[in-house]
């Protein structure tokens, strides 16, 4: 009878035909995969940890072609990093998601995820099941979002000073921070001009075009209500047109050619003369039709097949006093149409007066010896668009200035989406750590332990801020904890003064959406990494 019991229990019997060994399962493998994923993702977080905050370091990135980028924007650093491990790539995607959702906090979100993964390692080593950790983290996240919302204060879009402070806080950690007094108002004005503050719930940043022009300094950056193109005016005599009627064509003003490659053999000079006369008559007819509509400024889309504007056509346009700008990029067409109210024309037969846009002034502006820009201002079209011209002494400065302005615009977009502000300087994270620790005491068993670990992980932001600013992280975080325990919710690290103070009084503020988005996305990513127990390579 005992033999029967043994065979029924499902234990493999050690007979010659036994299949017990074929069902071998490596119990350690899921744990090894998990720790491998966590350590790879933590390595990415540690790589950009030093670039957090106003005193954070910048990274110099060199690509395969030898092009160099200098930045401390988390999303840009990670995007250009060569990350091979799939779990580490999840953190790169996380940073990208934060960039799309909020536009700021791209470094913080990766650091928070790295810290949460560190907590997971300790919990897993204590034998807690990944599912329990994952569910507890979700509970902690829900409570954390409540805490952040309680801490926030509402903001009105009419409160210009608050918007400026938010944009300035975003710019303070950038290379161009000393120009924040110029770039912050520019960003606020740009957003306010493209939305209706009373009804807007979001901002389409495609309505704000950033044009980069080498030369000058960042002080020369300007906001233009209208259109700015880096292309030069093709005709030398006409550089200014008032009461402009602007046409945009997508066909070429040159002699027609067949699609096939062919050659024409002309046997005598009379035929040659006839060919030239035909070409001249054809182009003159095109130019006359353009002039007939009342058009006095012509924009021509770039053509890759043949010359968009022949010398003969330019000669006729010059005689008829029509200003010409050629080689307009295809991706700029939509913005141009929205700005000046024109419509793109693909064939001369459709070129009529109602296709033209109008503006007070179209002119070519000289930039103190560093090239020229073409500007159209005083547009009568209803399309709400603006252009920001970014200047700088070299390519690296211009590109970093563009990224910084983009971040500032995104911060103001966050305030339009969710009209609430929260203190910066590590204050929300310390408050989260404190309140979640209290919350963990109301829970029981493993959940309480995991929520406590989640709370401790939040302290990484103030600790890193202090470290990067040259302060002692341990004493700084301890003092912050004490101040928050006494009810000083808005106390944070004042990096500029090198100490702890009421951050709201210092006007170091950020949109609530940035913090909420960072916490949510980081927790979701960590939960995803925790749930992975195997990596399978496919052919």
UniProtKB/Swiss-Prot annotation:
It comes from Mus musculus. GO terms for biological process: binding of sperm to zona pellucida; chaperone mediated protein folding independent of cofactor; positive regulation of telomerase RNA localization to Cajal body; positive regulation of telomere maintenance via telomerase; protein stabilization; scaRNA localization to Cajal body. Component of the chaperonin-containing T-complex (TRiC), a hexadecamer composed of two identical back-to-back stacked rings enclosing a protein folding chamber. Each ring is made up of eight different subunits: TCP1/CCT1, CCT2, CCT3, CCT4, CCT5, CCT6A/CCT6, CCT7, CCT8. Interacts with PACRG. Interacts with DNAAF4. Interacts with DLEC1. The N-terminus is blocked. This is T-complex protein 1 subunit delta. The gene is Cct4. Belongs to the TCP-1 chaperonin family. Component of the chaperonin-containing T-complex (TRiC), a molecular chaperone complex that assists the folding of actin, tubulin and other proteins upon ATP hydrolysis. The TRiC complex mediates the folding of WRAP53/TCAB1, thereby regulating telomere maintenance. As part of the TRiC complex may play a role in the assembly of BBSome, a complex involved in ciliogenesis regulating transports vesicles to the cilia. ATP binds at residues 53, 105-106, 174. The modification Omega-N-methylarginine is found at residue 19. The modification N6-acetyllysine is found at residues 21, 288, 302, 319, 326. Residues 1-29 are annotated as: Disordered. It comes from the Eukaryota. CDD domains: TCP1_delta. ADP binds at residues 53, 105-108, 172-174, 425, 510. Its EC number is 3.6.1.-.
């Amino acid at each position: 009878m005992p033999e029967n019991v043994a065979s029924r229990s499902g234990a493999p019997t050690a007979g010659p035909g036994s299949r017990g060994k074929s069902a071998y399962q490596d119990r350690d493998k899921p744990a090894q995969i998990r720790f491998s994923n966590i350590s790879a993702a933590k390595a990415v977080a540690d790589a950009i940890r030093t670039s957090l905050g106003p005193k954070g370091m910048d990274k110099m990135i060199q690509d395969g072609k030898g092009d160099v980028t200098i930045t401390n924007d988390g999303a840009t650093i990670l995007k250009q990093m060569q990350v091979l491990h799939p779990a580490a790539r999840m953190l790169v995607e996380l940073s990208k998601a934060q960039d799309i959702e909020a536009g700021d906090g791209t470094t913080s979100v990766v650091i928070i995820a790295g810290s949460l993964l560190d907590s997971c390692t300790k919990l897993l080593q204590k034998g807690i099941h990944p599912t329990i950790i994952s569910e507890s983290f979700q509970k902690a996240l829900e409570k954390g979002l409540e805490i952040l919302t309680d801490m926030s204060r509402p903001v009105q879009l009419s409160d210009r000073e608050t918007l400026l402070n938010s944009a300035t806080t975003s710019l303070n950690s950038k290379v161009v921070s000393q120009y924040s007094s110029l770039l912050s108002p520019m960003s606020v004005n740009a957003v306010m001009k493209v939305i209706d503050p009373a009804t807007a719930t979001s901002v389409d940043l495609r309505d704000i075009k950033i044009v980069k022009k080498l030369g000058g300094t960042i002080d020369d950056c300007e906001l233009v209500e209208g259109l700015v193109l880096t292309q030069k005016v093709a005709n030398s005599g006409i550089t200014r047109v008032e009461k402009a009627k602007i046409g945009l064509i997508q066909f070429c003003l040159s002699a027609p050619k067949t699609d096939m490659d062919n050659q024409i053999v002309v046997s005598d000079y009379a035929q040659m003369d006839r060919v030239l006369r035909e070409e001249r008559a054809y182009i003159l007819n095109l130019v006359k039709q353009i002039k007939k509509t009342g058009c006095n400024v012509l924009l021509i889309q770039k053509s890759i097949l043949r010359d968009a504007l022949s010398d003969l056509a330019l000669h006729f346009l010059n005689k008829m006093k029509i200003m010409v700008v050629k080689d307009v990029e295809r991706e700029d067409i939509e913005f141009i149409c929205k700005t000046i109210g024109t419509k793109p024309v693909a064939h001369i037969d459709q070129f009529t007066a109602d296709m033209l846009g109008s503006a007070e002034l179209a002119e070519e502006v000289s930039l103190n010896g560093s090239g020229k820009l073409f500007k159209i201002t005083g547009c009568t079209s209803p399309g709400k668009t603006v252009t920001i011209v970014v200047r700088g002494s070299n390519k690296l400065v211009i590109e970093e200035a563009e990224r910084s302005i983009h971040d500032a615009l995104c911060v103001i977009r966050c305030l339009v989406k969710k009209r609430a502000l929260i203190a910066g300087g590590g204050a929300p994270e310390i408050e989260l750590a404190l309140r979640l620790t209290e919350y963990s005491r109301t829970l029981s068993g493993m959940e309480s332990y995991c929520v406590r670990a989640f709370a401790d992980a939040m302290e990484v932001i103030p600790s890193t801020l202090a470290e990067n600013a040259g302060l002692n992280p341990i004493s700084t975080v301890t003092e912050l904890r004490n101040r928050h325990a006494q009810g000083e919710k808005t106390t944070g690290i004042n990096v500029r003064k090198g100490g702890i103070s009421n951050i709201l009084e210092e006007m170091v503020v950020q949109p609530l959406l940035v913090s909420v988005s960072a916490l949510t996305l980081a927790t979701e990513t960590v939960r995803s990494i925790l749930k992975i127990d195997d990596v399978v390579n496919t052919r």
